A protein has these predicted regions:
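Positively charged n-region of N-terminal signal peptides that target proteins for export
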Residues: 1-4
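Bacterial N-terminal signal peptides
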Residues: 8-17
């Protein structure tokens, strides 16, 4: 049944260095098969993220100055400018987007995938922008910076007056309007500061890393589900993965927990991502004995499908050989070494258009011997199911990964947050008399498809849509079936694994390993005990010899200490004992992928 549902939905939705400071001067875009209009669509399309009211974000000052938070502070934190867009009047950074509640018309600031998956590098005096590459930004610095600025705005009368003047405009002198704004700000801070407090870890993530699983889990399983005790410190940050080729990989996430073989699975991955960056979701019920009346989300699933389809066309970046040539003799020798020692895990994908699925290799932690914290955090431990107990056969506690996966699946099929349906989609889907065109249309509208898109889909896919809807009904009926007794093996040791994916474009994605603990490809080929134990992250100056970014301290960089929990740079060093010459040969070949 699930296979048919997935298949049907697939048919449905078919000189070597730069400073850590913001890049100035002309930026060149590497050839990755995206024309300028497609690139701007990726940079500016909302996926339903809603951090705070849009007018607040535009008006917000840095906590200790009168400078603009988004114009002045975000570039300091590594977020890239987007001044070329015609669909971005306020010149928001790449991946920061305006979202609108289609029912109330309220506007919000949000983020899309481009904010964390676009980077710039400098090589031989030129600056290149790489789409789909891991950003060198400081997301935790951004979140805490917002907290500091909001608190300063609430507490400093002059700062609040300037804030109110920008937000309220002509109403800024209206005492009642200012009082209402102050109350709204205070109430927002109760939620926001609690979120920051619960998410604060002893050792901040630093540049180029995010604990994506931890943030998504806390947002969905603690805040949205309304169970504070489910919250767990997001203390296993990982390197931001690159996006080219992702659509064709059988599994995604560093620990491979997200299946990715069809468009509904890809949509689930993207819905989980936007829930982690502040999409709204409602999972709570009025009673622990019933399914929530409205399980709704602001995730704009149609837009997410659009963005995913753009990523399918994104090519990996080619090494800029016109600036630094690849040594062909070393490359040939390195290719032979790669075929002997590496290709069994890291398949080779030709540069250019990709249409062929790739079965990624999942490697046991006992074999690769890299830091276990991310895999352990995502796998070990249980969480409360709360109002959704019936979705888990009556179990009050389930493994953390299972809870998150189910909540994301529920969000995928939930009504669109800004639509006010007459009854819950979950109620309707458990009835047997609702396979008409109108009902299917309503479902498609509720998950974010436009009227025009729904009409076009029905013109060609009427029977397939009905089949998908029937499959979906069967799935939901299984969700709301009778509770069954079940136990949780809390102490059962899971088999921890990490993903080994193709390495196309790997040269543009430092630092390396899943936790970003190795600064260059050259060091990745060293034994673990010979790698750098402390280095700085955030510089965009590129070392074309070792293939990585400059690691000296500079303004805006953050220290990476491999002795801290979750930061080990050990492992991935048992696949061949290379001498120095062989290391450089492999580096030269890796540049060419």
């Amino acid at each position: 049944m699930k296979t048919r549902m997935f298949a049907t939905l697939c048919l449905l939705i078919g000189g070597l260095f730069l400073s850590a400071a913001p890049v100035s001067g002309q930026v060149e875009f590497l050839e990755q098969n995206w024309p300028a209009d497609v690139r701007q669509e990726f940079y500016t399309t909302s996926q339903g993220s809603r951090i705070m009211p849009y007018s607040w974000f535009i008006a917000l000052e840095i906590s200790d100055s009168q400078k603009s938070f988004y114009r002045d502070r975000l570039p300091e934190l590594g977020y890239l400018p987007n001044s070329l867009s015609t669909n971005n009047p306020d010149k928001l950074p790449v991946g920061f987007v305006r979202d609108q509640n289609e029912f109330t018309k309220a506007e919000y600031i949000g983020m899309n995938c481009a904010a964390c998956h676009t980077n710039q590098i400098s090589l031989s005096g030129k600056t290149f922008q790489v789409d789909g590459a891991p950003a060198l930004s400081d997301m935790w610095g951004m979140l805490t910076g917002l907290d500091d600025s909001l608190k300063a705005t609430r507490d400093n009368a002059d700062k609040f007056d300037r804030f109110a003047a920008k937000v309220l405009g002509a109403e800024a002198n209206n005492t009642a309007a200012k009082k209402k704004l102050k109350s709204e700000l205070t109430n927002f801070l109760k939620y926001w500061s609690k979120f920051i407090q619960d998410s604060t870890v002893e050792h901040p993530w630093g540049r180029a890393r995010i604990d994506a699983f931890g943030m998504i889990f806390n947002r969905v399983a603690s805040i949205d589900l309304g169970i504070p005790e489910n919250s767990k410190k997001p203390d296993a940050p990982v390197s931001v993965p690159f996006l080219w080729g992702t659509s064709f990989q059988s599994q995604v996430q560093w620990n491979g927990v997200a299946p990715n073989t069809n468009d509904i699975e890809r949509l689930g991955r993207n819905v989980g991502e936007v829930l982690g960056v502040f999409a709204e979701a409602e999972f709570q019920a009025t009673s622990i004995f019933e399914i929530p009346k409205f399980a709704r989300t602001s995730a704009k699933r149609f837009n997410q499908v659009r963005l995913e389809n753009l990523l399918k066309k994104l090519w990996s970046p080619k090494w800029p050989e016109q600036l630094v040539a690849i040594d062909t003799a070393k490359k040939a020798a390195g290719e032979a070494l790669y075929q002997t020692h590496c290709v069994s895990c890291h398949a080779i994908v030709p540069h250019g258009e990709q249409n062929t699925p790739v079965d990624v290799k999942m490697t046991k932690l006992s074999e690769v011997r890299t830091d276990p914290k991310m895999a352990a955090n995502a796998t070990i431990g249980v969480a409360s199911t709360g109002d959704l107990k019936l979705l888990f056969q009556g179990r009050s506690k389930v493994p953390r990964g299972e809870l998150l996966q189910t909540l994301v699946q529920l969000a995928v099929i939930s009504p669109y947050r800004d639509v006010a349906p007459p009854e819950s989609i979950l109620d309707r889907l458990t009835r047997d008399d609702l396979f008409g065109t109108n009902e299917i249309n309503l479902f498609l509208r509720e998950i974010g498809f436009s009227k025009q898109t729904v009409q076009a889909l029905h013109a060609d896919l009427d029977e397939k849509l009905k089949s998908y809807y029937e499959d979906l009904q069967s799935t939901v009926k299984s969700f709301v079936g009778q509770p069954e007794s079940a136990t949780v093996a809390e102490n059962a040791p899971p088999t921890l694994k990490y993903k080994a994916a193709p390495l196309a474009g790997i040269w543009a994605t430092a630092p390396y390993l899943h936790n970003g603990s190795v600064p260059s490809l050259y060091e990745l080929l060293l034994p673990g005990n010979e790698r750098t134990s402390k280095f700085y992250v955030g510089s965009r100056e590129f070392d074309a010899k070792k293939v990585g970014f400059k690691t000296e301290q500079a303004p805006g960089t953050t220290l990476f200490d491999t002795s801290l929990p979750g930061n080990s740079n050990a492992g991935h060093d048992t696949y061949g004992t290379f001498n120095e010459e062989q290391r450089w040969q492999l580096v030269e070949y890796l540049k060419s992928l």
